């Protein structure tokens, strides 16, 4: 499994209130607001790295992921941590003059989040040359999660040329893609994974309906947070997958990445899209019960037991 995406340090803070209470709808065009961030903590993060970490929780199944992206001169410790977790970091390019990207995340009392992302070294190196024909031939799937837009497009073209099926996961970069690039990405991806807002934004930029967007992919997965997710097949079949109730809610940061890691693990093991989505949903629940994006763990036996309790069926991995 090839995972393309950001590698970052996350600085997580809490806001004791609700964001909307500090905003005046009539004055949004002249926004000048300050929020107090409490309990600042730093964690390992980045969409690509988070997905790989969650995928690695299933390494006991004999599957592995390769992280594709760029980090800075401060990546050595982070890289060792990922390697120890079972993530292959050979395709990570290092900018020895820049720093690894950083995300500043503020969460309010209703789990709404504001994020400021500093790309750092992300756009400074071309790492596609690391992706050899030998590596491409060994891939089952790939996912293109949030990264520098130009690199996402270059990688998509390379994967298409090699015949590798890939998922488009634009996330917070949805707004940044050029129209012609969005048309290419949505016309050539095997599947799309996005939340409701990102799907609406895609439709707005492409000037098409959601129904037409769904028909572009073999599968489109619409994530709904605690509402679970919807799976749309090109055939028109829609399936709803419930979320798994957490024992406690500690930190929602990275839940989407956790879902993707679990989903891709299931898919790599040959499970159906629907079964893989259930694997992803439970992985996300484990994540929300811990602070940070790479601090949750489970054994396969624990996971299978909780899966059976949540979905009333045996886990197929």
List each language-model region with its residue ranges:
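Conserved phosphate-binding/catalytic loop of the ribokinase/pfkB sugar-kinase fold
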Residues: 90-95, 103-146
């Amino acid at each position: 499994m090839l995972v393309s995406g950001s590698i970052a340090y996350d600085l997580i803070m809490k806001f004791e209130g609700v964001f909307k209470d500090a905003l005046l709808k009539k004055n949004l065009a002249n926004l000048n607001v300050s929020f107090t961030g409490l309990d600042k903590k730093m964690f390992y993060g980045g969409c690509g790295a988070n997905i790989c970490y969650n995928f690695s929780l299933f390494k006991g199944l004999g599957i592995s992921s390769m992280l594709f992206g760029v980090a800075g001169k401060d990546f050595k410790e982070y890289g060792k941590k990922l390697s120890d977790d079972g993530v292959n970091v050979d395709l990570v390019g290092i900018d020895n003059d820049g720093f690894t990207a950083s995300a500043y995340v503020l969460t309010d009392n209703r789990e709404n989040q504001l994020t400021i992302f500093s790309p750092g070294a992300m756009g400074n190196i071309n790492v596609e040359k690391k992706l050899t024909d030998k590596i491409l031939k060994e891939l089952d799937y790939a996912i293109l999660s949030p990264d520098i837009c130009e690199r996402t497009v270059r990688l998509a073209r390379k994967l298409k040329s090699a015949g590798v099926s890939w998922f488009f996961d634009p996330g917070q970069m949805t707004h940044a893609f050029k129209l012609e690039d969005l048309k290419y990405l949505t016309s050539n991806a095997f599947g799309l994974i996005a939340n409701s807002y990102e799907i609406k934004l895609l439709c707005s930029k492409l000037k098409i309906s959601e129904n037409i967007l769904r028909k572009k992919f073999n599968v489109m997965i619409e994530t709904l947070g605690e509402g679970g997710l919807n799976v749309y097949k090109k055939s028109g079949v829609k399936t709803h997958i419930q979320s798994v109730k957490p024992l406690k809610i500690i930190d929602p940061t990275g839940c989407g990445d956790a879902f993707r890691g679990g989903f891709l693990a299931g898919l790599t093991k040959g499970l159906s899209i629907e079964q893989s989505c259930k694997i992803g949903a439970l992985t996300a629940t484990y994540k929300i019960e811990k602070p940070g994006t790479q601090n949750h763990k489970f054994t396969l036996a624990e996971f299978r037991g909780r899966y059976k309790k949540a979905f009333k069926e045996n886990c197929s991995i």
